[in-house]
């Protein structure tokens, strides 16, 4: 017998009919279009007993010779003699960043990674780094966890590049950037604590940035190069690469689509989460079957099975035009179900 628990309250998907390319980015976050003046921006470091310009530059800036830049900016006559409590200005453009990693916490079916070479199979607890590419096959699922607890899940036929995973040493500011080149990625982002923290997902035409929310980005690489964004919790700014400073805010339970050129469509309310017609049905047949209470505006239904209540360890999914989903060869066990209208 197979036990199934339905989990629908946290997922609401839109019937978005336009063929578009979408992405999200808060204007204040988007890093690709920072003005040249940002190179002159500084942050303050309070000197401590025993500090020298050499030490400060070595700890917090990018190059060994950056002490000379510190001396020039701050007018320090003696680089080896700094009084404690002095407010030193450090140039933001030269702040040193340390590379972070991500961890694979769930993998099912065909899931692979490439680190500048050939693809190799992914396994649970594998470590991913900046520059890695992750892809799933027709039956593959993978979920990765970032250092702050953010989760990103790839369903079948998806590909995600880890473009930047960094932390600024002095300020602790996080900089995470990903590029979705095929399929979908579901993200549950831990709320960003610092003003300059950045979390972005890019498609070939748009960028999606948030400060703490749950949302999905889908890029249709095989079709019309459209990108779709659905916001499940919080707020996301949506803009094309060329209009990133003019973001359209999309709130929870709304979605947006844009053209491949980055023109953003108006937010559209998502459909209500579907319910099972027979939630107490005992699944004791060879095929596991779910009947969905039909929604008048739905064109179809997306049904997923997971091993865990958080729906991070997904292992099967299907899309159906009819309000019935059938899964074959599901081992006996207790599973969790997610249904979305499309």
Feature-to-residue mapping (PLM):
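Conserved aromatic anchor
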Residues: 286-298
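Surface-exposed, short loops/turns at beta-strand junctions within beta-sandwich domains
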Residues: 327-334
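Short proline/glycine-enriched turn/loop motifs at strand-loop junctions of beta-rich domains
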Residues: 64, 107-108, 295-300
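Short beta-strand segments within Ig-like beta-sandwich modules, predominantly Fibronectin type-III
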Residues: 314-321
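Flexible, surface-exposed loop/linker segments and immediately adjacent secondary-structure boundaries
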Residues: 83-87, 92-286, 301
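Primarily a LysM-type cell-wall glycan-binding module
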Residues: 35-61
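N-terminal signal peptide c-region/cleavage motif recognized by signal peptidases
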Residues: 27-30
